[in-house]
Amino acid sequence: MELLSALSLDDLAASFSKLPVFPLFDVAYYIISILYLKYEPGAVDLSKRSPVASWLCAMLYCFGSYILADVLLGESPIHYFSNNANILLASAVWYLTFFCPLNIFYKIVSFLPVKLVLVGMKEVVRVRKIAMGIHHAHHHYHHGWVIMVLIGWVKGSGVALMSNLEQLLRGVWKPETNEILHMSFPTKASLYGAILFTLQQAHWLPISKAYLIFFFTLFMAVCKIYMTATHSHGSPFAIFESGICYVLFAAANGDHDDHGNHHHHHDDHDVSHSAGKSKEEHNEGTRKRKTKKAE
């Protein structure tokens, strides 16, 4: 904290943490979310065939994190739909993305320089949602650290965690695309961010919430802008994760491999033994037939 104070970032971090996300940043969040929906196979055909189903998918993309978090906390899953301004804005973005004449709106927001700005603005909303999720969970469960992490994670990546439900609305069923089995970078980053914000909420991390929001937003925005500009699907956490997994789980994996090899050798021995036994029985049967023929 002394180093951060020496950098004179107190006012900047405090101002940034209080920066309102509605309506500018929220609109950017809706645009990028629904843009990714349009990239999904069959999404355009669905919007023409069943606009209601397409609109529901768009609402899940925009508000799925709130819905899932409310369900986990035992609250009404449609509570967020009482925010008329947000629903109208998201609906307007959905309509313009799919039905704007000559596809003008889609061409503008998918133009790379514009898209990069919108992607960075979306990460501002994501980090703010993680922080609010931790605060909301702490209000219900003061010492439920796991619950805080879970709600913060869901708030940051709820739409990805609900991808299978959204696919069902589009008439698609791909259980192998489960986000928990194959986490994308935003899902992993939301989980790690939720852990950091929970540690800060528990006063185990010696940094203010304003600083954490500022630096984590900066990290997320830079990573996502770079990945979008380079069309990269890798993860900045890959090296860190591989090292941790090697330290924590490599021995167990080795034991499993040895166990599997032991079974393999045992099976080979059984097969060779059975083959030898069959050969002996065949030779003995041949001798008996020859003896009988001689008699």
Curated annotation (Swiss-Prot):
Residues annotated for Ca(2+) binding in this entry: G74
Catalytic activity field: K(+)(in) = K(+)(out)
InterPro entries xrefs: TRIC_channel
Basic and acidic residues composition-biased segments: 267-286
Residues in compartment: Cytoplasmic: 40-51, 106-144, 200-201, 255-295
Compartments reported by the entry: Sarcoplasmic reticulum membrane; Nucleus membrane
Recorded topology in the membrane: Multi-pass membrane protein
Annotated binding of a 1,2-diacyl-sn-glycero-3-phospho-(1D-myo-inositol-4,5-bisphosphate), by residue: K122, R126
GO molecular function: identical protein binding; metal ion binding; potassium channel activity
Keyword terms: Calcium, Ion channel, Ion transport, Membrane, Metal-binding, Nucleus, Potassium, Potassium channel, Potassium transport, Sarcoplasmic reticulum, Transmembrane, Transmembrane helix, Transport
Regions that span the bilayer: 19-39, 52-72, 85-105, 145-165, 179-199, 202-222, 234-254
GO cellular component terms listed in the entry, alphabetical order: nuclear membrane; sarcoplasmic reticulum membrane
Activity regulation info: Channel activity is activated by a change of voltage within the sarcoplasmic reticulum lumen and blocked by luminal high Ca(2+) levels.
Family of the protein in this entry: Belongs to the TMEM38 family.
Function of the molecule: Intracellular monovalent cation channel required for maintenance of rapid intracellular calcium release. Acts as a potassium counter-ion channel that functions in synchronization with calcium release from intracellular stores. Opened by a change of voltage within the sarcoplasmic reticulum lumen.
Descriptive protein name: Trimeric intracellular cation channel type A
Species of provenance: Xenopus laevis (African clawed frog)
Source organism phylogeny: Eukaryota, Metazoa, Chordata, Craniata, Vertebrata
